[in-house]
Amino acid sequence: MIENHVGCYETGSLDFFGPLCVVACYVDQKDEKELNELELDKEMSTNDIEKIGKILKDKLTYSLLLLDNSHYNQYVKEGQKLSCIKAKLYNQAMINVIQRIEHPISKVTIDAFLAPKKYYRYLKNKIVVVRHIEFKEEMSLAMKCARILSQYAYLQYYQNMCQSLNTTLPRGFNILANDTGTFLVHEYGKDILYKVSKTNFPNYKQILERVK
């Protein structure tokens, strides 16, 4: 049987277009059987993510922090690295969840995107820092739920972006992202990239070179 625990995960850090979505969520022992029946380990389609995301959203205590592109790029402009931005969002999302849980929490788990020393170094100026975190390669049940919830939030935002721009934005950061970015600059001007993409990705400079 699992312990009562909190897990944290993010979606968006590997996508040139779209926000950064960090979710922390709490999983109770009594939820284990029902959550395992959802087969959270399987490869999921967009429909699967939307269907299961809605179930988890209604069932679990969680915190979503969504950093849109304009705010993300402002942090980058100030000299913050992606890993630093993620560490701060993870810490705040976990604080939000832990403050809402009345039961004892046995452990807190996150993906090992940073060495623990570096993670805590990024948080040295924060007044409240969640400590005694397990940095895991293998995901806990709460991390699996947080992953789905972050994907669900990202998809909702992403679909709205595609609709408002009247184009399909590619996921990832390959040549298709450059082609779409070039199209958007021709349609809306260079400033559009600051609003819809991550300017610290190589794609950003490559697109600006194309449209000179």
Question: Model-flagged regions — what are they?
Answer:
Residues 1-212:
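RNase H-like, Mg2+-dependent phosphodiesterase core
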